[in-house]
A protein has these predicted regions:
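Membrane-water interface of alpha-helical transmembrane segments
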Residues: 2-12, 39-43, 69-83
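Membrane-embedded alpha-helical segments of integral membrane proteins
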Residues: 6-63
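Helical transmembrane-bundle signal
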Residues: 18-22, 86, 90-93, 251
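Transmembrane helix-loop junctions and nearby membrane-interface residues
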Residues: 23-33, 91-94, 98-101, 256
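Cytosolic-side transmembrane helix boundary signature
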Residues: 49-84
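Short coil-to-helix leader/linker segments, especially the first N-terminal amphipathic alpha-helix
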Residues: 75-100
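A structural signal for short, hydrophobic/glycine-enriched beta-strand patches
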Residues: 92-247
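A transmembrane-helix-recognition feature enriched in membrane-embedded lipid enzymes
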Residues: 241-260
Length: 260
């Protein structure tokens, strides 16, 4: 076995392992949320992306262009070019989102927006709790700031993400006159559109969301008219970070291709 074949073998193991890891996390989430159809659609996109990673690894290991027959050789080259291009696009977005997760430009502001996250079995997910932890600490540092809690997706009982966040912050002693709800929107884009009607989008605003979500959240906020965005990423689980980044990649590509 030569060096290329050894590298290909390692890549195959990594690609298959990542696919299994991603599948375990996503299947658990799909079973826990109300928005099963939306989550299942993105999961299918993720599996397609993983298939390209596996094909890339197989090409490195076995070589798609090694066939003796000319037709098969041309087909091998076409497949290789497609796989390499798709893999390069995926890696570009993975890198962009990962780098964006580390950027923090926090500063005092009149308003701060906390983005919601789908409830799991009627309870806030760990990453949503982390967003609230980050928001609470920011409020303590900035006593004049108003917090806009967004998220209109209800659980099975009808409670929205925004309402759940308000109740949790109230339990922590945050006064309700410092909290404003945007509980009508079911997408991040509509969250910002509705919030732009509640506050002046030309004023500086702090954006609080999970670190892996910041890249897409900032782009969406800018498209809704917010021009002075201060980024405050909330830490997320290291175990599921890879799956979350892949989720964001699929949503960004979905937006680019279908304009959503």
């Amino acid at each position: 076995m030569n060096v290329r074949q050894k590298i290909g073998t390692v890549l195959i193991i990594l690609a298959v392992t990542f696919t299994v890891y991603l599948s375990v996390i996503m299947i658990r989430r799909i079973n826990a949320v109300v928005l099963k159809a939306a989550y299942t659609k993105i999961f299918c996109y993720e599996l397609a992306a993983c298939a390209f990673f596996i094909l890339f690894a197989l090409d490195v290991r076995f070589g798609f262009t090694g066939a003796e027959h000319q037709v098969l050789k041309v087909a091998g080259w076409c497949l290789r070019i497609l796989v390499v291009l798709v893999t390069a696009v995926l890696l570009f977005f993975i890198g962009k989102i990962t780098i964006g997760s580390f950027i923090c430009t926090e500063a005092p502001a009149k308003n701060a927006i906390v983005l919601g996250l789908a409830l799991e079995n009627g309870k806030p997910a760990d990453d949503l709790v982390s967003r609230l932890d980050t928001a609470e600490k920011y409020l303590q540092r900035n006593p004049d700031t108003t917090l806009i809690l967004t998220g209109g997706n209800p659980d099975e009982s009808g409670r929205t993400e925004a309402a759940v966040m308000r109740d949790l912050l109230a339990e922590r002693g945050i006064k309700e006159d410092r909290l404003m709800l945007e509980d009508q929107a079911e997408t991040t884009k509509d969250n910002f559109r509705n919030t732009a009607r509640l506050i002046n989008p030309d004023d500086p605003v702090v954006l609080i969301s999970s670190n892996y979500h910041m890249d897409r959240a900032v782009q969406t906020a800018q498209s809704a008219g917010f021009s002075k965005i201060l980024r405050l990423p909330a830490p997320s689980s290291l175990i599921s970070f890879g799956a979350n980044v892949m989720w964001e990649v699929m949503l960004e590509l979905d937006g680019l291709v279908f304009g959503k």
